[in-house]
């Protein structure tokens, strides 16, 4: 394995940035910001925003680094991930572990000292849920790994909300529910596109265990459910007409992609659906934010 020869390969600072999965973390931090602003009747202080984003971002980077560490053997098999820093051997197991521990402790310390203890606790639970429960167990144990593990990935807007209010509110849980419902169609579309790689790595993703067509049906059904769930902020008067129109347009467009995916055998459509799902979530939360102030 390449990881055995890590000491022979040069380590670049960009490898440590890659360990943190920056693109994933940036999308996550967008949902944190939206959670913060939705929790506040007015504007949120820049100081609180800075410490919240830095603390949660460092913890998210720590969880991502642990994911690289635990999945290094799987990553070395899959074409999409075989050149990741730990899998390829540019960063050793020991280096990755120390990096994850240090930035994780830094993030939690910032949240405890400058935000609040509730947010720090929830962030820690989320870190353990993703890095420990999902990465360490669920990913290899069940085809519902994404569904169950999605709870950890859906937490960021709740963390942003509690950073401002220092309490759990039902409205914040609606934001969690949106991301929780979005997660399966998002990841299953990628799993269809990377079906052979997951099969070779012996990861029990839904297309591998139940077949591609069954997975397409589940993507379709979850996308319908997501469209319904995404309207709940308007139903409970958490948001207004701007958000409603945005959610409807985005939801219908996502449903069009799910429909197209169900009736085609072209792998590229699965990747296009996956990419749109990222744009969908980003724009949906932008609509929430815009609607809140306008």
Curated annotation (Swiss-Prot):
GO biological process: heme O biosynthetic process
Cited function: Converts heme B (protoheme IX) to heme O by substitution of the vinyl group on carbon 2 of heme B porphyrin ring with a hydroxyethyl farnesyl side group.
Membrane topology: Multi-pass membrane protein
PANTHER family: 4-HYDROXYBENZOATE SOLANESYLTRANSFERASE, PROTOHEME IX FARNESYLTRANSFERASE, MITOCHONDRIAL
Transmembrane segments: 24-44, 48-68, 96-116, 118-138, 145-165, 172-192, 224-244, 245-265, 268-288
Family listed: Belongs to the UbiA prenyltransferase family. Protoheme IX farnesyltransferase subfamily.
HAMAP family in the cross-refs: CyoE_CtaB (MF_00154)
The keyword tRNA processing is annotated on this UniProt entry: no
Enzyme Commission number(s): 2.5.1.141
Keywords: Cell inner membrane, Cell membrane, Heme biosynthesis, Membrane, Transferase, Transmembrane, Transmembrane helix
Annotated compartments: Cell inner membrane
Keyword rRNA-binding set for record: no
CC annotations in GO: plasma membrane
Enzymatic reactions: heme b + (2E,6E)-farnesyl diphosphate + H2O = Fe(II)-heme o + diphosphate
This protein's name: Protoheme IX farnesyltransferase
InterPro entries: Protohaem_IX_farnesylTrfase, UbiA_prenyltransferase, UbiA_prenylTrfase_CS, UbiA_sf
GO molecular function: protoheme IX farnesyltransferase activity
Gene3D superfamilies recorded: UbiA prenyltransferase
Organism name: Legionella pneumophila subsp. pneumophila (strain Philadelphia 1 / ATCC 33152 / DSM 7513)
Known pathway: Porphyrin-containing compound metabolism; heme O biosynthesis; heme O from protoheme: step 1/1
One Pfam family this sequence matches: UbiA
Miscellaneous remark of the record: Carbon 2 of the heme B porphyrin ring is defined according to the Fischer nomenclature.
């Amino acid at each position: 394995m390449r990881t055995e020869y890590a000491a022979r390969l040069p380590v670049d600072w960009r490898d440590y940035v890659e360990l943190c999965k920056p693109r994933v973390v940036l999308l996550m931090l967008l949902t944190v910001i939206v959670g913060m602003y939705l929790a506040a009747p007015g504007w949120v202080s820049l100081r609180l925003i800075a410490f919240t984003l830095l603390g949660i971002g460092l913890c998210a980077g720590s969880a991502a680094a642990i994911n690289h560490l635990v999945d290094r053997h799987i990553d070395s098999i899959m074409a999409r991930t075989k050149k990741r820093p730990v899998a390829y051997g540019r960063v050793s197991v020991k280096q990755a572990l120390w990096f994850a521990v240090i930035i994780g402790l830094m993030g939690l310390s910032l949240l405890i000292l400058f935000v609040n203890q509730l947010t720090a606790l929830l962030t820690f639970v989320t870190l353990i849920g993703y890095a420990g429960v999902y990465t360490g167990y669920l990913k290899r144990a069940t085809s519902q790994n994404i569904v169950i593990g999605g709870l950890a990935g859906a937490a960021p807007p709740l963390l942003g909300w509690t950073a401002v209010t220092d309490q759990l509110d039902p409205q914040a849980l609606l934001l969690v529910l949106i991301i929780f419902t979005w997660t399966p169609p998002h990841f299953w579309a990628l799993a269809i596109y990377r079906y052979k790689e997951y099969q070779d790595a012996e990861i029990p993703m839904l297309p591998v265990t139940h077949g591609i067509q069954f997975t397409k049906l589940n993507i379709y059904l979850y996308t319908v459910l997501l469209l319904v769930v995404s309207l709940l902020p308007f139903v409970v008067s958490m948001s207004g007409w701007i958000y409603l129109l945005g959610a409807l347009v985005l939801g219908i467009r996502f449903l069009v992609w799910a429909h197209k995916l169900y009736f085609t055998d072209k792998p590229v459509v699965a990747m296009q659906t996956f990419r749109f799902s990222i744009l969908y979530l980003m724009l949906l939360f932008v609509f929430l934010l815009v609607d809140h102030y306008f």
